[in-house]
Amino acid sequence: MEIGILGLPLSGKSTLFEIMTALRSRDVHGEVCVRGQATVPDDRFEHLVKIFQPLKVSPAKVPFVDVNAVGERAWDALRQNLSGADGFVQVVDGFSVDRVEEVIKRYQQMEDELIISDLQIVENRLERMEKTSKKGLSPQDVAQAQILPLLKEQLDRGKPLRELGLTAEEVHSLRSFSFWSIRPELVVVNTAEGNPGMADAFKELVAPQTPVLGICCLTEAELAGLSREEQKEFLADLGIEEPAFGRIIRAAFSLLGRIAYFTCGADEVKSWVIPACSKAPKAAAAIHKDFERGFIKAEVVSYADFQLFGSAFAAAKAAGKMRLEGKEYIVQDGDIITFRFNV
């Protein structure tokens, strides 16, 4: 799992990367591509740490990639370093302009790069298929011949493939093309101090299914440099419950369809990241493949039930909230699990 950060020069994308990952991307030996991990804020996890007081604490992480390149080489650098990204966060400058139409224009400029790249891929593939059609098409070619014209029509309209409403099966069948605009995207509008309404105005003008969040990177960078107690005071003065970058990290986490379950004990409290709708054996594989191979049962209690019954396993079990689940159980976000296995 990896999320690429997109944005025009001076949009604030590298600043956002630095805030979320605590890395100075522009100072890493002049490298074009910098990778870092952001901790996913989770009150449930913090509560479990307080209860178990473990020797080791392992919160959920989201990997981000920032590419520092400008000019003619910028898009080539993006292609090279973000081709494996599962989704994108596009940061848009909303602080240096007064009109939301200008923000839309800058957002669309980056979207157009993705769309044009995908259009070239589709056209090249259709051209090759036309040349080889006389020799006969494979079943895979036949399936592609049916869907590629639909993709081309969407791209010709200047619309990203993610807005086409493709099924999960169709998206999976197109993975070999590595389309850019088919991947999920979160838009972050970097606003001026005191002008959060710019992000709201932007959201009104883009596709309804486009997730949009606003942030003032200038304020958030100042906040990130403070201690935990100083942050609380700073936020209280502003009447804000949490830093905006925390919401962005969580939104990026859910954007990729990920959830977290917990394992808890005196040695370690850990948040395990898995795809949503994972069955128990696959969730166990996140710990070790042997857990999946020798899976017997999963002892499960939801975080909500655990907290409701005094944050104690014994009380939750006495109340009938501790369950033994089999191979078909679909793990839910926030489950606290102990796996039983035998290899």
Say what each PLM segment does:
Residues 18, 28, 100-104, 199-201:
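Short amphipathic alpha-helical segments
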Residues 41-45, 61, 75, 82-86, ...:
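Amphipathic alpha-helical transducer elements in NTP-driven molecular machines
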Residues 48, 89, 122, 190, ...:
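Residue-level signal for inorganic ion chemistry
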